[in-house]
Amino acid sequence: MFIRTENFQTFIRLYPVVTFILALQAVLWLFFSLPAHSVVLWRDTVTGYNLGVANGEWWRLITPILLHAGFTHLLFNSMSIFLFAPALERMLGKARFLLVYAGSGIIGNIGTYVTEPLDYVHVGASGAIFGLFGVYLFMVLFRNELIGQEHSKMIITLLAFAVLMSFINSNINMMAHLFGLCGGFLLSFLCVQKKERRY
């Protein structure tokens, strides 16, 4: 379920939404890494910035999901998406998977806006990724037949570790993680159908 054995072409064919997300955030990281002044201005316009949201720049609740602070940040989040997102795209379908992913990220950014000071600045897909864990948590609690006992234990262990690290690491947007997790869990009531089959 979480072990990728597909070749490149098969991965793209089976998981088009996941592929698009991975490619888009990589392209955006490369673009915004350019030292040009105009690029820096563009980045400042789409970065998560609570004061900007307060001034009506609502897109800042969406765009930070695709942005990253550095290569390590991008790599870690991309690996998390690569490992944990494909199974959900297959189980939920493209539309519902995208709803969960984007919805959780937006909910995480709304939570950041509500709880953090106005000068708070943030980027990253972590809220959306925690939303995926929220879906898995829903399955562990209510639809265990979809993932099985072994994967359930793995999810609980990984989630406990991730939440713990969110509290320990001061550079992590803890509110995006927690709100994203809750968002993914709640969206599961809408997106995880009774007819769903195990991956």
Curated annotation (Swiss-Prot):
Its main location: membrane. It is found in: Cell membrane. The chain crosses the membrane at residues 14-34, 65-85, 97-117, 122-142, 147-167, 172-192. GO terms for cellular component: plasma membrane. It comes from the Bacteria. The keyword Acyltransferase does not apply. The keyword Hydrolase applies. GO terms for biological process: proteolysis. Its EC number is 3.4.21.-. InterPro entries: Peptidase_S54_rhomboid_dom, Rhomboid-like_sf, Rhomboid_protease_S54. Keywords: Cell membrane, Hydrolase, Membrane, Protease, Transmembrane, Transmembrane helix. It is an enzyme of class 3 (hydrolase). GO terms for molecular function: serine-type endopeptidase activity. Pfam families: Rhomboid. It is a multi-pass membrane protein. The active site is at S126 (nucleophile), H177 (charge relay system). Belongs to the peptidase S54 family. This is Putative rhomboid protease YdcA.
